[in-house]
Amino acid sequence: MSDTVIILQDECILAAEGKEGRIPKVSQVFRIPVDSYGDSVEQWKKALSKYNEEHHPDRVKLVLPVNYSTARMTQIPYVSGKQLSNMAHNVMLENGIEGMADYSVVSADKKQGVCLCCGSATEELLKKLADMFEEISLPVHTISVPMEGYLRLLSQLKAYK
């Protein structure tokens, strides 16, 4: 089973197919043109519908555009489980993140604490995207913000050394 990362942008959509793992392997990369005028979600829908028909991706990880999402990096004391969820939620509220939000753990160390990447997008945008995925049968398993991708890349680069 291959993974596909799709990066939404106003001017185009980037798609990379490959295998996830300790050392990810990219097998194909595509730049999908998008009309630069009109409703962005409708333009993405047209482009992704065609891509989906041609490539039939198994698992899609979607990265939201920078201008449609927000991301915050924060450090909290070392906790796990329910405490981690509660602290991350409080941090997102304190930072004024609006809409729907989630977080991922970038690093965790008992002495240094937990480094979180908190991302959010408006509920309206996420609803439009969810409706679009369902309509074109695109198997999206994960939605992320660009900052999380950068951080994962940096952690992969450290793992190579």
Where are these regions (language model features)?
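Internal amphipathic helical hairpin motif
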Residues: 64-119, 151, 157-158
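Short alpha-helical segments and helix-capping/turn motifs at coil-helix boundaries
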Residues: 1, 45-49, 126
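Short glycine-rich phosphate-binding loop at a beta-alpha junction
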Residues: 48, 53-68, 141-144
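N-terminal phosphate-binding loop and adjacent alpha-helix
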Residues: 26-52
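Amphipathic alpha-helical regulatory segments at dimerization interfaces
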Residues: 47-51, 91, 132
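Small-residue (GG/TT-enriched) beta-loop-alpha framework at ligand/catalytic clefts
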Residues: 2-25, 31, 54, 110-161
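Short amphipathic alpha-helical segments
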Residues: 40-44, 80-84, 121, 125
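Buried hydrophobic packing residues in well-ordered domains
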Residues: 15, 62, 91-92, 133
